[in-house]
Every structure is written in C-alpha cells, then in structure tokens.
C-alpha cells in the first residue's frame, strides 16, 4: 500500500539525513563519525532538518557569492 511505501521511504530519508549530519559534525569538530553519532541520535528530527537546511543554505550562498564576484 501507499502508506507502507511512504513510511519506508521516509525512514530511509531520516537515516540518510542522520548519517549526513554526523559526517558534517565530525568534520567540523575534528572527531570520528562514531563519536558524533550518539549526539546526532539524541537530536530531534527538527534539529537534524535544521542542520541539513543550514548546511545546504551555506553552500548555495557561497555559490551565489562566487557567481556575483565574476
């Protein structure tokens, strides 16, 4: 059914977002992904989404700035 497909896709997306945020935080803090993973697992879904939005927002802003300088 559509419900089970949607839940499955949503769970996979949440898992991928958690992995991405852990990777970014580990890089930022200079720690291993495993060390940061517990902190990420304790975060709410809203906090994780905010990390994803801010990360991609910064990238978009940097690209826009570069294109305006040229």
UniProtKB/Swiss-Prot annotation:
- Keywords associated with the record: Antibiotic, Antimicrobial, Secreted, Toxin
The primary location reported for this protein is secreted
One GO biological process term is: defense response to bacterium
Q: Where in the cell is it found?
A: Secreted
Mind telling me which GO cellular component terms the entry cites? Answer: extracellular region
Q: In which tissues is it expressed?
A: Expressed by the venom gland.
Q: Provide any one GO MF term from the record.
A: toxin activity
Domain of life where this protein originates: Eukaryota
What this protein is reported to do is described as: Insecticidal and antimicrobial peptide. Has insecticidal activity against larvae of flesh fly S.carnaria. Has antibacterial activity against Gram-positive bacterium B.subtilis B-501 (MIC=1.25 uM) and Gram-negative bacterium E.coli DH5alpha (MIC=2.5 uM).
Q: What is known of its domains?
A: Both the N-terminus (1-33) and the C-terminus (38-70) of the mature peptide form alpha-helices which probably disrupt target cell membranes. The linker region (34-37) probably derives from a processing quadruplet motif (PQM), found in propeptides of many zodatoxins, hinting at a fusion of two originally separate membrane-active peptides.
The entry's family comment says: Belongs to the cationic peptide 06 (cytoinsectotoxin) family.
Protein name (Swiss-Prot/TrEMBL): Cytoinsectotoxin-2c
